[in-house]
Amino acid sequence: MLIRTLTLILVFLFSSSLYAQIPKAPEKKEGEGQFAQLIIRGVTLINGNGAPPIGPVDIVIEKNRIVQVASAGSPHMPPGKNRPKLKEGGKELNCEGMYALPGFVDMHGHIGGTGQGTPAEYVFKLWMAHGITTIRDPSAGNGLDWTLDEKKLSAENKITAPRILAYTAFGAGAKQPITTPELAIEWVRENAKKGADGIKFFGAAPDIMDAAIRENKKLGLRSCAHHA
C-alpha cells in the first residue's frame, strides 16, 4: 500500500510540473504558398510501402492533399503528352532527377523547454528540414494550452511547423492525486474536453491505468507510455 501511495504521489508531482515555456514560433514571413494547386514535376517517387521507386511522375497537390500521381513518361525519354495541367494560381516545381517520399512522423518529439536552450521556431524548422512533417509531443511539456495553440497555428499555415499532436501527461493539471478509477475517468474526460489528442502514461496502479485507458479509447483518443 505504501509503495502504491508513493508511486501515485510521484506520478502526480511529475505530471503536474512542466518545462518552463519557451517562446512560441513567430508568424511565418518567408517562403511561398499555400497554392491553389502544386504540381511536383518529373520526380522519382518512393511511396513508403516497400515497393521499388517509380518515375518519373507528376504529383498533384490541392488543398493540402495529394489528389493525383500521374506518369510523366519513361526515364531518359521525352516527357509524356498527357500530363496534368496547371490550374490558375498554381505552382510548378521541376524536380527531374530528384526523389520524393512521404513526410516522416516523429512519434516522440518533445518541443522542449528553456533547459533545451532553443525556441520553438528553431525546433520546428529543424524537424521540417529533416523531412518530419508530423510530430507527437508526449507530455505536452510546455502546457496543453500552449501546445494546442501552436497546433492550431501550424494547421492554419501561419507558422513554419509540422503538424502537431498533443499528448497530455496523465494527471497533469489535476487538483489532487488520482487515487481511484473514478478520478482517473473524470480526468480523462476533462482532458478530452480540453482538446488533447491523447495521453502519455508514466505509470499508475493497474486498476487506475486500466480505467483511464478504457475511457480514453471510448472517447476516441490515443495513448502512449514511458516504459523504462
Regions found by a protein language model. Give the residues of each.
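Short active-site segment of divalent metal-dependent hydrolases/proteases
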Residues: I111-G112
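Histidine-rich, glycine-flanked metal-binding segment
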Residues: I22-G33, L45, A51-L101
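Catalytic Zn2+-binding segment of zinc metalloproteases
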Residues: G115
